[in-house]
Amino acid sequence: MRKFKPGKAMTVFVVFFFPVLLVLGAWQVNRGIEKQEIWEVHNFQKSQSVIDELEILGMNNSEAIYRSVFLEGRFGEETYLLDNRTYRQEAGYEVFTIFRTAEKNSYLVNRGWVSKNKIDIKNETKESKSTSIEGIYSPFRRFGLDLSEAVVSSSWPKVVQELDFDIASFDLGLDLKRVVIQLSAASEHAYEPIWQPAEFNPSRHFGYAVQWFGLALV
């Protein structure tokens, strides 16, 4: 019986690609676990009672994040229209507007998604009357495309391709809270809520992990 001798191609694969595929699979598993933990915290916090601004300000960040919060104040004219947001196969914007509270704090509020065919641009430049809103107190992560430079126009509303804390706080010149209020669908001035606490579900990462591990075993 001839002794099996792997060819050069198989040797190269085993030495170089097999470990890489295992690392990629393990990375996706870790990402899935991270996303699962985020969803679990979000679901638990969301199940708690709604709290007001004074209560939220008295908490540390881990206690406050993802809690439902009730705020009183008014929307300003400062609105960002985050471009390239497709929902149900339709192009639109995700709308972010400054909300100034009765406690003299400024928050950026994600009012949800709206079709480009349905948004009234002129109406977005008006400051609202005093109102109360409810939403999820969420981390201020980057929204949109990851660009090296953010091009921001000089008039409101501003159409942007990306939005993060540094861009918004510099552009607004405000002592902005490092959170975004994810406006509830029942609140005044809300559009279609599409926000999720994590961009992908854990199952998606676990699915990718299975694919990488499968390739390693082929």
Cite the ranges covered by each PLM segment.
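Surface-exposed, charge/polar-rich loops and edge strands
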Residues: 1-57, 64-218
